[in-house]
Amino acid sequence: MIKVASITKVEDGSIVTPKGFSAIGTAIGLKKGKKDLGAIVCDVPASCAAVYTTNQIQAAPLQVTKDSITTEGKLQAIIVNSGNANACTGMKGLQDAYEMRALGAEHFGLKEKYVAVASTGVIGVPLPMDIIRKGIVTLIPAKEENGAHSFSEAILTTDLITKETCYEMIIDGKKVMIAGVAKGSGMIHPNMATMLSFITTDARIEHDVLQTALSQITNHTFNQITVDGDTSTNDMVIAMASGLSETKPIDMEHADWETFVFALQKVCEDLAKKIAQDGEGATKLIEVNVLGVQTNEEAKKIAKQIVGSSLVKTAIHGEDPNWGRIISSIGQSEVAINPNTIDITLQSISVLKNSEPQTFSEEEMKERLQEDEIVINVYLHLGKETGSAWGCDLSYEYVKINACYRT
């Protein structure tokens, strides 16, 4: 049983709150007038885990990071640039990514295999290595919160807000910290995709155990968000565990294993929601919960089908309670359902009961649809499993942003 009372959100926490971590973000000239290069550094080689995009076209930095992590399952630094994806840049792009790793290792005095690299931005443009070379040597990570916040700014592209979260958990009666930072706004339809996320913790946990937990939780969080249905070439989630907390090693047999997993899930869920809420041109976060299904996978599939529907997204943007678009999406999900037993609530107002339309106050509904967060609940009465997905509305601004992205 998960000890929820053993987990507390730390409102002013960041990726440098867990013991052993420091961070920095700075402007080196990849983006005009904005921070565009950052680093997270650990005092010791940290156990690590990662989940990557499933796009068959994988960017050079992602390939280099895979190479680093598979060597020992440890990392000590992550270097990230924004403004340039270093994707579809051929062999030269791969060489540049390896050089970026080598430059970081030299600057921080680390083994190359302990350094990961990540890039995000425009695809198909060579990475300006003269700028990268001059920039990396200026990185001086700080253990203070301003270092973490500057890093969160340096990894942004079309994002409007930074995305950070932090939790404290009790393991073996002692405080253990876990935190995360992310970027992502457009081209979001992960399996894993369209976003970068970096998680730090001082938990004592080995690479393979952390990988199991991260892979499992990613399927319930990051893989359940969608903004525009496009899957990126670059993006990934990396978790680093310094092991500097004074607890016994955490594994699946540990009495507090579920506490750790729940805390990791909360970090990933917080970041996933922030990404969905910050979707390009978004004005509303949409949460879809599907209940009463035979399997969790089926529930998640239906939820993602609904939240990814352009017609549902535009209806929410227009504050139109058009539940017909919701039930149509349910039918398109390819999950076997009973079309006669569907209940739907929109902002806790019943709009469909046993697949029959319900009378509701248009005035009350309009008022609730003006809120920033919209919740759609679907009850299928087929089983006991549930699943959720997150997305955002689709606005005129989304088209403007993406029509002019390169300019």
From Swiss-Prot:
Gene3D superfamilies linked to this entry: arginine biosynthesis bifunctional protein suprefamily, ArgJ beta chain, C-terminal domain, L-amino peptidase D-ALA esterase/amidase
What top-tier enzyme class does this entry carry?
A: transferase
Could you list this entry's UniProt keywords, alphabetically sorted: Acyltransferase, Amino-acid biosynthesis, Arginine biosynthesis, Autocatalytic cleavage, Cytoplasm, Multifunctional enzyme, Transferase
Positions binding substrate in this chain are 157, 183, 194, 280, 402, 407
Predominant place of localization: cytoplasm
Which InterPro entries is this protein grouped with? Arg_biosynth_ArgJ, ArgJ-like_dom_sf, ArgJ_beta_C
**One Pfam family here:** ArgJ
Compartments reported by the entry: Cytoplasm
Chemical reaction(s) catalysed: N(2)-acetyl-L-ornithine + L-glutamate = N-acetyl-L-glutamate + L-ornithine; L-glutamate + acetyl-CoA = N-acetyl-L-glutamate + CoA + H(+)
Q: Which NCBIfam families match?
A: ArgJ, PRK05388.1
What's the protein called, per UniProt? Answer: Arginine biosynthesis bifunctional protein ArgJ
